[in-house]
Amino acid sequence: MRYLLSIILIASGFNSWSQTTIIRQDQQIKTMVEEVSSQNIESIVRKLVSFQTRHSMSDTLSATTGIGAARNWIKSELERYSAASGGRLKVEFDTFTQAADGRRIATPMVMKNVLGLLPGTDPADDRVFIVSGHYDSRASDVNDSKIFAPGANDDASGTAAAMELARVMSKFKFNCTLIFVAMVAEEQGLYGATNLAKRAKAEGWNVAGMITNDIVGNTYGIETGLKDNNSVRIFSEGVSVVESPEEVVRRASTGSENDGNARQFARYFKEVGERYVEQLDVKLIYRRDRYLRGGDHTPFSQLGFAGIRVTEMNENFDRQHQTVRKENGTDYGDLPDFVDYEYTRKVTRMNLASLANLALAPREPQKVGIVTSGLTNKTELRWELPAGEIPIGYYVVMRETSSPVWQKKFFVADTKAIFNYSKDNYYFGVQSVDSDGHESLVVIPRSVR
Protein backbone atom coordinates (compact mmCIF):
# COMPACT_ATOMS: atom_id res chain seq x y z
CA MET A 1 0.00 0.00 0.00
CA ARG A 2 2.87 2.40 0.76
CA TYR A 3 4.10 1.93 -2.81
CA LEU A 4 0.65 2.48 -4.27
CA LEU A 5 0.08 5.75 -2.48
CA SER A 6 3.48 7.06 -3.50
CA ILE A 7 3.00 6.41 -7.20
CA ILE A 8 -0.04 8.66 -7.56
CA LEU A 9 0.62 11.41 -10.06
CA ILE A 10 0.29 14.85 -8.52
CA ALA A 11 -0.61 17.74 -10.80
CA SER A 12 -1.50 21.30 -9.91
CA GLY A 13 -2.97 21.94 -13.33
CA PHE A 14 -3.07 20.71 -16.89
CA ASN A 15 -0.27 22.92 -18.24
CA SER A 16 2.94 20.93 -18.51
CA TRP A 17 4.98 23.68 -16.81
CA SER A 18 2.91 23.35 -13.63
CA GLN A 19 3.06 19.58 -13.28
CA THR A 20 5.12 17.59 -10.83
CA THR A 21 5.33 13.83 -11.29
CA ILE A 22 6.49 11.44 -8.61
CA ILE A 23 8.24 8.48 -10.22
CA ARG A 24 8.23 5.11 -8.45
CA GLN A 25 9.69 2.01 -10.08
CA ASP A 26 9.02 -1.62 -9.28
CA GLN A 27 12.35 -3.18 -8.31
CA GLN A 28 11.71 -6.40 -10.23
CA ILE A 29 10.96 -4.52 -13.44
CA LYS A 30 13.93 -2.24 -12.87
CA THR A 31 16.16 -5.31 -12.51
CA MET A 32 14.88 -6.71 -15.81
CA VAL A 33 15.31 -3.38 -17.58
CA GLU A 34 18.90 -3.08 -16.42
CA GLU A 35 19.72 -6.59 -17.66
CA VAL A 36 19.01 -5.68 -21.29
CA SER A 37 22.42 -5.69 -22.97
CA SER A 38 23.60 -3.71 -25.98
CA GLN A 39 26.38 -6.28 -26.40
CA ASN A 40 23.84 -9.09 -26.73
CA ILE A 41 21.79 -7.05 -29.17
CA GLU A 42 24.85 -6.31 -31.31
CA SER A 43 25.91 -9.96 -31.24
CA ILE A 44 22.49 -11.05 -32.50
CA VAL A 45 22.46 -8.43 -35.27
CA ARG A 46 25.93 -9.38 -36.51
CA LYS A 47 25.09 -13.09 -36.41
CA LEU A 48 21.97 -12.53 -38.50
CA VAL A 49 23.97 -10.45 -40.99
CA SER A 50 26.50 -13.30 -41.25
CA PHE A 51 23.93 -15.43 -43.08
CA GLN A 52 24.54 -13.12 -46.10
CA THR A 53 20.86 -12.92 -46.98
CA ARG A 54 17.67 -13.65 -45.10
CA HIS A 55 15.47 -13.14 -48.12
CA SER A 56 12.29 -15.14 -47.61
CA MET A 57 12.84 -17.00 -50.89
CA SER A 58 16.52 -17.74 -50.23
CA ASP A 59 18.28 -21.02 -49.41
CA THR A 60 16.58 -23.15 -46.75
CA LEU A 61 19.04 -26.08 -46.76
CA SER A 62 22.42 -24.48 -46.10
CA ALA A 63 23.68 -24.39 -42.53
CA THR A 64 25.46 -21.09 -43.07
CA THR A 65 23.59 -19.05 -45.67
CA GLY A 66 20.01 -17.99 -46.25
CA ILE A 67 16.68 -17.85 -44.48
CA GLY A 68 16.81 -21.49 -43.40
CA ALA A 69 20.10 -21.12 -41.55
CA ALA A 70 18.86 -17.89 -39.96
CA ARG A 71 15.63 -19.34 -38.61
CA ASN A 72 17.37 -22.46 -37.32
CA TRP A 73 19.87 -20.30 -35.45
CA ILE A 74 17.13 -18.09 -33.97
CA LYS A 75 15.29 -21.20 -32.78
CA SER A 76 18.46 -22.61 -31.23
CA GLU A 77 19.09 -19.34 -29.39
CA LEU A 78 15.55 -19.26 -28.02
CA GLU A 79 16.00 -22.88 -26.93
CA ARG A 80 19.12 -21.81 -25.07
CA TYR A 81 17.10 -19.12 -23.30
CA SER A 82 14.46 -21.76 -22.56
CA ALA A 83 17.02 -23.96 -20.84
CA ALA A 84 18.07 -21.02 -18.67
CA SER A 85 14.40 -20.46 -17.78
CA GLY A 86 13.97 -24.03 -16.58
CA GLY A 87 12.05 -24.94 -19.71
CA ARG A 88 9.29 -22.39 -19.16
CA LEU A 89 9.90 -20.69 -22.53
CA LYS A 90 8.28 -22.90 -25.17
CA VAL A 91 9.99 -22.62 -28.56
CA GLU A 92 8.43 -23.59 -31.87
CA PHE A 93 8.29 -22.90 -35.57
CA ASP A 94 5.00 -21.43 -36.78
CA THR A 95 5.07 -23.13 -40.19
CA PHE A 96 2.87 -22.37 -43.19
CA THR A 97 3.00 -22.62 -46.97
CA GLN A 98 2.76 -19.28 -48.70
CA ALA A 99 1.13 -19.41 -52.12
CA ALA A 100 2.67 -17.67 -55.11
CA ASP A 101 1.31 -14.14 -55.44
CA GLY A 102 2.57 -13.17 -58.90
CA ARG A 103 4.46 -10.30 -57.35
CA ARG A 104 7.04 -11.14 -54.66
CA ILE A 105 6.43 -14.86 -54.15
CA ALA A 106 7.32 -16.64 -57.40
CA THR A 107 6.46 -20.18 -56.30
CA PRO A 108 4.76 -21.70 -53.23
CA MET A 109 7.18 -21.60 -50.30
CA VAL A 110 7.25 -23.20 -46.87
CA MET A 111 7.88 -20.37 -44.42
CA LYS A 112 8.46 -20.27 -40.69
CA ASN A 113 7.99 -17.71 -37.98
CA VAL A 114 10.00 -18.50 -34.85
CA LEU A 115 8.04 -18.29 -31.60
CA GLY A 116 9.04 -18.26 -27.95
CA LEU A 117 5.94 -18.64 -25.76
CA LEU A 118 6.16 -17.78 -22.07
CA PRO A 119 2.94 -19.06 -20.45
CA GLY A 120 1.29 -16.99 -17.75
CA THR A 121 1.06 -18.30 -14.21
CA ASP A 122 -2.56 -17.25 -13.54
CA PRO A 123 -5.03 -19.74 -15.08
CA ALA A 124 -7.75 -17.08 -14.91
CA ASP A 125 -5.72 -14.59 -16.97
CA ASP A 126 -5.99 -15.46 -20.66
CA ARG A 127 -4.41 -12.26 -21.96
CA VAL A 128 -1.71 -12.66 -24.60
CA PHE A 129 0.84 -10.01 -25.55
CA ILE A 130 2.91 -10.51 -28.70
CA VAL A 131 6.18 -8.69 -29.41
CA SER A 132 8.04 -9.14 -32.68
CA GLY A 133 10.69 -8.13 -35.15
CA HIS A 134 11.01 -9.54 -38.68
CA TYR A 135 14.12 -11.54 -39.48
CA ASP A 136 13.89 -11.54 -43.29
CA SER A 137 15.89 -9.03 -45.32
CA ARG A 138 16.10 -7.58 -48.82
CA ALA A 139 18.26 -5.44 -51.10
CA SER A 140 17.27 -2.95 -53.82
CA ASP A 141 15.64 -5.64 -55.95
CA VAL A 142 13.00 -7.11 -53.66
CA ASN A 143 12.96 -10.33 -55.69
CA ASP A 144 16.72 -10.96 -55.65
CA SER A 145 17.07 -13.82 -53.17
CA LYS A 146 20.82 -14.38 -53.68
CA ILE A 147 22.48 -10.96 -53.35
CA PHE A 148 24.04 -9.87 -50.06
CA ALA A 149 21.20 -8.37 -48.01
CA PRO A 150 22.49 -7.65 -44.49
CA GLY A 151 19.29 -6.10 -43.13
CA ALA A 152 21.03 -5.00 -39.94
CA ASN A 153 18.61 -2.24 -39.02
CA ASP A 154 15.68 -3.50 -41.11
CA ASP A 155 15.06 -5.61 -39.24
CA ALA A 156 17.76 -7.54 -37.44
CA SER A 157 17.53 -4.73 -34.87
CA GLY A 158 13.87 -5.49 -34.12
CA THR A 159 14.51 -9.23 -34.14
CA ALA A 160 17.36 -8.73 -31.69
CA ALA A 161 15.07 -6.66 -29.48
CA ALA A 162 12.44 -9.41 -29.40
CA MET A 163 15.07 -12.07 -28.71
CA GLU A 164 16.69 -10.04 -25.93
CA LEU A 165 13.26 -9.57 -24.37
CA ALA A 166 12.79 -13.34 -24.47
CA ARG A 167 16.18 -13.92 -22.87
CA VAL A 168 15.57 -11.56 -19.97
CA MET A 169 11.85 -12.00 -19.35
CA SER A 170 11.79 -15.80 -19.55
CA LYS A 171 13.62 -15.89 -16.21
CA PHE A 172 10.63 -14.27 -14.50
CA LYS A 173 6.97 -15.15 -13.98
CA PHE A 174 4.02 -13.13 -15.23
CA ASN A 175 0.26 -13.40 -14.82
CA CYS A 176 -0.44 -13.68 -18.54
CA THR A 177 1.22 -15.14 -21.62
CA LEU A 178 3.98 -13.39 -23.56
CA ILE A 179 4.96 -14.46 -27.08
CA PHE A 180 8.27 -13.35 -28.59
CA VAL A 181 8.32 -13.68 -32.38
CA ALA A 182 10.82 -13.47 -35.21
CA MET A 183 8.51 -12.93 -38.21
CA VAL A 184 9.23 -14.06 -41.75
CA ALA A 185 8.23 -12.54 -45.10
CA GLU A 186 7.55 -9.02 -43.92
CA GLU A 187 9.33 -7.70 -47.01
CA GLN A 188 7.22 -9.89 -49.30
CA GLY A 189 3.90 -8.59 -48.01
CA LEU A 190 3.55 -9.15 -44.24
CA TYR A 191 2.89 -12.84 -44.85
CA GLY A 192 4.39 -14.16 -41.63
CA ALA A 193 2.39 -11.75 -39.49
CA THR A 194 -0.75 -12.42 -41.51
CA ASN A 195 -0.42 -16.14 -40.87
CA LEU A 196 0.15 -15.65 -37.14
CA ALA A 197 -2.71 -13.16 -36.81
CA LYS A 198 -5.09 -15.58 -38.52
CA ARG A 199 -3.88 -18.37 -36.25
CA ALA A 200 -4.48 -16.21 -33.19
CA LYS A 201 -8.01 -15.45 -34.38
CA ALA A 202 -8.81 -19.05 -35.29
CA GLU A 203 -7.49 -20.43 -32.01
CA GLY A 204 -9.25 -17.81 -29.92
CA TRP A 205 -6.19 -16.13 -28.44
CA ASN A 206 -7.10 -13.12 -26.33
CA VAL A 207 -4.44 -10.88 -27.87
CA ALA A 208 -4.58 -7.79 -25.69
CA GLY A 209 -1.75 -6.13 -27.59
CA MET A 210 0.75 -6.75 -30.39
CA ILE A 211 3.98 -4.79 -30.83
CA THR A 212 6.27 -4.91 -33.82
CA ASN A 213 9.74 -3.43 -33.46
CA ASP A 214 10.73 -2.63 -37.02
CA ILE A 215 13.79 -0.47 -37.78
CA VAL A 216 14.91 0.46 -34.27
CA GLY A 217 18.66 0.95 -34.65
CA ASN A 218 19.37 4.17 -36.55
CA THR A 219 19.64 7.65 -35.07
CA TYR A 220 20.49 9.77 -38.14
CA GLY A 221 17.90 11.29 -40.46
CA ILE A 222 18.84 11.60 -44.10
CA GLU A 223 18.14 14.99 -45.76
CA THR A 224 17.32 16.69 -42.46
CA GLY A 225 20.69 15.85 -40.90
CA LEU A 226 19.00 15.29 -37.54
CA LYS A 227 20.77 13.05 -35.04
CA ASP A 228 18.64 11.89 -32.13
CA ASN A 229 19.20 8.89 -29.88
CA ASN A 230 16.66 10.08 -27.31
CA SER A 231 13.41 9.72 -29.27
CA VAL A 232 11.41 6.82 -30.63
CA ARG A 233 8.08 6.71 -32.44
CA ILE A 234 5.06 4.54 -31.73
CA PHE A 235 2.49 4.35 -34.52
CA SER A 236 -1.10 3.44 -33.68
CA GLU A 237 -4.37 3.49 -35.57
CA GLY A 238 -7.29 5.47 -34.21
CA VAL A 239 -10.36 3.88 -35.73
CA SER A 240 -10.49 0.11 -35.98
CA VAL A 241 -11.38 -1.35 -39.36
CA VAL A 242 -13.64 -3.87 -37.61
CA GLU A 243 -15.86 -1.33 -35.85
CA SER A 244 -19.46 -2.43 -35.50
CA PRO A 245 -22.25 -0.04 -36.57
CA GLU A 246 -23.00 0.58 -32.90
CA GLU A 247 -19.36 1.48 -32.25
CA VAL A 248 -19.38 3.90 -35.19
CA VAL A 249 -22.37 5.72 -33.72
CA ARG A 250 -20.85 5.81 -30.24
CA ARG A 251 -17.52 7.12 -31.53
CA ALA A 252 -19.21 9.85 -33.53
CA SER A 253 -21.34 10.97 -30.59
CA THR A 254 -18.55 10.98 -28.00
CA GLY A 255 -15.61 12.07 -30.16
CA SER A 256 -13.60 9.01 -29.15
CA GLU A 257 -11.67 8.55 -32.39
CA ASN A 258 -8.41 8.81 -30.42
CA ASP A 259 -9.41 6.25 -27.81
CA GLY A 260 -9.32 2.96 -29.66
CA ASN A 261 -7.49 -0.02 -28.19
CA ALA A 262 -4.31 0.65 -30.18
CA ARG A 263 -4.16 4.28 -29.01
CA GLN A 264 -4.57 3.19 -25.38
CA PHE A 265 -1.84 0.60 -25.86
CA ALA A 266 0.50 3.23 -27.33
CA ARG A 267 -0.20 5.69 -24.50
CA TYR A 268 0.58 2.97 -21.99
CA PHE A 269 3.93 2.28 -23.65
CA LYS A 270 4.80 5.96 -23.51
CA GLU A 271 3.87 6.39 -19.85
CA VAL A 272 5.52 3.25 -18.51
CA GLY A 273 8.46 3.25 -20.92
CA GLU A 274 9.44 6.78 -19.91
CA ARG A 275 8.96 5.81 -16.25
CA TYR A 276 11.78 3.27 -16.47
CA VAL A 277 14.06 4.37 -19.32
CA GLU A 278 16.08 7.53 -18.87
CA GLN A 279 16.70 9.93 -21.73
CA LEU A 280 13.97 8.46 -23.91
CA ASP A 281 11.10 10.51 -25.31
CA VAL A 282 8.35 8.32 -26.76
CA LYS A 283 6.58 10.15 -29.59
CA LEU A 284 3.01 9.05 -30.23
CA ILE A 285 2.29 9.14 -33.96
CA TYR A 286 -1.43 9.02 -34.60
CA ARG A 287 -1.55 6.92 -37.75
CA ARG A 288 -1.14 3.22 -38.44
CA ASP A 289 2.24 3.56 -40.18
CA ARG A 290 4.42 5.80 -42.33
CA TYR A 291 3.54 6.78 -45.90
CA LEU A 292 4.33 4.07 -48.47
CA ARG A 293 5.32 1.60 -45.74
CA GLY A 294 3.77 -1.18 -43.70
CA GLY A 295 4.57 -3.34 -40.72
CA ASP A 296 3.72 -6.63 -39.06
CA HIS A 297 1.26 -5.00 -36.66
CA THR A 298 -1.07 -4.28 -39.57
CA PRO A 299 -2.50 -7.81 -40.06
CA PHE A 300 -3.30 -7.88 -36.34
CA SER A 301 -4.99 -4.48 -36.55
CA GLN A 302 -7.03 -5.66 -39.51
CA LEU A 303 -8.42 -8.51 -37.40
CA GLY A 304 -9.37 -6.21 -34.54
CA PHE A 305 -6.36 -6.66 -32.26
CA ALA A 306 -4.54 -3.68 -30.73
CA GLY A 307 -1.42 -3.45 -32.89
CA ILE A 308 1.31 -0.81 -32.62
CA ARG A 309 4.60 -0.19 -34.42
CA VAL A 310 7.78 0.93 -32.67
CA THR A 311 10.34 2.53 -34.98
CA GLU A 312 13.23 4.98 -34.84
CA MET A 313 12.60 8.72 -34.87
CA ASN A 314 14.68 9.62 -37.93
CA GLU A 315 15.27 7.31 -40.89
CA ASN A 316 18.16 7.00 -43.33
CA PHE A 317 16.72 5.62 -46.55
CA ASP A 318 20.19 5.15 -48.04
CA ARG A 319 20.47 2.26 -45.58
CA GLN A 320 17.08 0.64 -46.07
CA HIS A 321 16.15 -1.66 -48.96
CA GLN A 322 19.46 -0.83 -50.64
CA THR A 323 22.09 -3.01 -52.29
CA VAL A 324 25.42 -2.55 -50.50
CA ARG A 325 27.61 -0.21 -52.56
CA LYS A 326 29.40 3.13 -52.62
CA GLU A 327 28.04 5.58 -55.15
CA ASN A 328 29.09 9.21 -55.64
CA GLY A 329 30.77 9.15 -52.25
CA THR A 330 27.69 7.85 -50.44
CA ASP A 331 27.58 4.52 -48.61
CA TYR A 332 24.44 2.53 -49.34
CA GLY A 333 23.25 -0.61 -47.63
CA ASP A 334 21.98 -1.79 -44.27
CA LEU A 335 25.25 -2.77 -42.59
CA PRO A 336 25.74 -3.57 -38.89
CA ASP A 337 28.36 -0.84 -38.41
CA PHE A 338 25.62 1.73 -39.01
CA VAL A 339 23.44 0.54 -36.10
CA ASP A 340 23.44 2.46 -32.81
CA TYR A 341 23.25 -0.45 -30.37
CA GLU A 342 22.89 1.72 -27.27
CA TYR A 343 19.82 3.26 -28.88
CA THR A 344 18.39 -0.17 -29.67
CA ARG A 345 18.98 -1.11 -26.05
CA LYS A 346 16.90 1.88 -24.92
CA VAL A 347 14.06 0.89 -27.23
CA THR A 348 14.24 -2.70 -26.00
CA ARG A 349 14.15 -1.51 -22.40
CA MET A 350 11.04 0.55 -23.15
CA ASN A 351 9.38 -2.57 -24.56
CA LEU A 352 10.36 -4.60 -21.52
CA ALA A 353 9.17 -2.12 -18.91
CA SER A 354 5.78 -1.69 -20.55
CA LEU A 355 5.22 -5.39 -21.22
CA ALA A 356 6.32 -6.43 -17.74
CA ASN A 357 4.13 -3.84 -16.05
CA LEU A 358 1.14 -4.99 -18.09
CA ALA A 359 1.80 -8.69 -17.62
CA LEU A 360 2.12 -8.28 -13.85
CA ALA A 361 -1.00 -6.11 -13.57
CA PRO A 362 -4.56 -7.17 -12.81
CA ARG A 363 -6.96 -7.30 -15.73
CA GLU A 364 -9.00 -4.29 -16.79
CA PRO A 365 -12.13 -3.31 -14.86
CA GLN A 366 -15.37 -4.50 -16.44
CA LYS A 367 -18.51 -2.65 -17.54
CA VAL A 368 -16.97 0.78 -17.10
CA GLY A 369 -19.69 3.39 -17.43
CA ILE A 370 -20.07 7.15 -17.37
CA VAL A 371 -23.48 8.22 -16.07
CA THR A 372 -25.50 10.30 -18.54
CA SER A 373 -28.92 10.23 -16.88
CA GLY A 374 -29.19 14.00 -16.50
CA LEU A 375 -27.55 17.36 -17.05
CA THR A 376 -24.71 18.05 -14.61
CA ASN A 377 -21.30 19.67 -14.46
CA LYS A 378 -19.94 16.72 -12.49
CA THR A 379 -18.75 13.38 -13.82
CA GLU A 380 -19.93 10.12 -12.29
CA LEU A 381 -18.18 6.86 -13.18
CA ARG A 382 -18.89 3.31 -12.09
CA TRP A 383 -17.48 -0.08 -12.99
CA GLU A 384 -17.21 -3.70 -11.91
CA LEU A 385 -14.34 -5.84 -10.65
CA PRO A 386 -12.04 -7.36 -13.27
CA ALA A 387 -11.91 -11.09 -13.83
CA GLY A 388 -9.17 -12.90 -11.95
CA GLU A 389 -6.88 -11.09 -9.52
CA ILE A 390 -8.68 -8.50 -7.39
CA PRO A 391 -6.91 -5.14 -7.63
CA ILE A 392 -6.16 -3.03 -4.60
CA GLY A 393 -7.83 -0.13 -6.36
CA TYR A 394 -8.20 1.80 -9.58
CA TYR A 395 -6.89 4.88 -11.29
CA VAL A 396 -9.40 7.17 -12.93
CA VAL A 397 -7.44 8.94 -15.66
CA MET A 398 -8.39 12.24 -17.19
CA ARG A 399 -7.25 14.50 -20.00
CA GLU A 400 -8.40 17.51 -21.96
CA THR A 401 -10.05 16.63 -25.26
CA SER A 402 -7.12 18.09 -27.20
CA SER A 403 -4.43 16.24 -25.23
CA PRO A 404 -2.81 13.11 -26.70
CA VAL A 405 -1.94 11.71 -23.26
CA TRP A 406 -3.62 11.27 -19.89
CA GLN A 407 -2.88 14.28 -17.68
CA LYS A 408 -4.24 13.35 -14.24
CA LYS A 409 -4.65 10.09 -12.33
CA PHE A 410 -6.90 9.76 -9.30
CA PHE A 411 -6.66 6.72 -7.05
CA VAL A 412 -10.04 5.23 -6.13
CA ALA A 413 -10.47 2.27 -3.78
CA ASP A 414 -14.16 1.81 -4.66
CA THR A 415 -15.87 0.85 -7.94
CA LYS A 416 -17.47 4.25 -8.37
CA ALA A 417 -16.41 7.86 -8.20
CA ILE A 418 -17.74 11.38 -8.75
CA PHE A 419 -15.51 14.25 -9.91
CA ASN A 420 -16.05 17.99 -10.03
CA TYR A 421 -15.08 18.11 -13.68
CA SER A 422 -17.55 18.16 -16.55
CA LYS A 423 -17.55 15.09 -18.79
CA ASP A 424 -18.32 17.49 -21.64
CA ASN A 425 -14.86 19.03 -21.33
CA TYR A 426 -12.61 16.04 -20.60
CA TYR A 427 -12.05 12.42 -21.49
CA PHE A 428 -12.02 9.85 -18.69
CA GLY A 429 -10.87 6.26 -18.36
CA VAL A 430 -10.39 3.64 -15.64
CA GLN A 431 -7.58 1.14 -15.05
CA SER A 432 -6.97 -1.47 -12.36
CA VAL A 433 -3.86 -1.31 -10.17
CA ASP A 434 -2.28 -3.76 -7.73
CA SER A 435 -0.38 -3.13 -4.49
CA ASP A 436 2.93 -2.89 -6.37
CA GLY A 437 1.64 -0.21 -8.73
CA HIS A 438 1.22 -2.37 -11.85
CA GLU A 439 -1.57 -0.83 -13.93
CA SER A 440 -3.85 -2.47 -16.46
CA LEU A 441 -4.69 -0.89 -19.77
CA VAL A 442 -7.19 1.96 -19.60
CA VAL A 443 -10.86 1.25 -20.34
CA ILE A 444 -12.91 4.07 -21.87
CA PRO A 445 -16.39 4.30 -20.28
CA ARG A 446 -19.63 3.83 -22.14
CA SER A 447 -22.71 5.89 -21.42
CA VAL A 448 -24.99 4.39 -18.74
CA ARG A 449 -28.12 5.68 -17.04
Regions found by a protein language model. Give the residues of each.
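N-terminal capping segment at the start of a domain
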Residues: 20-66, 319, 326-334
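A non-catalytic alpha/beta surface segment that caps or lines the substrate-entry region
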Residues: 43-119
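Active-site-adjacent mobile loop/cap segments within catalytic or ligand-binding domains
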Residues: 49, 216-237, 284-362
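Alpha-helical metal-binding/catalytic segments enriched in His/Glu/Asp
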Residues: 116, 131-132, 136-137, 141-190, ...
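Metal-dependent peptidase/peptidase-like ectodomains
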Residues: 183-295
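Conserved aromatic anchor
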Residues: 377-390
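Short beta-strand segments within Ig-like beta-sandwich modules, predominantly Fibronectin type-III
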Residues: 407-414
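Beta-strand-rich modules
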Residues: 418-440
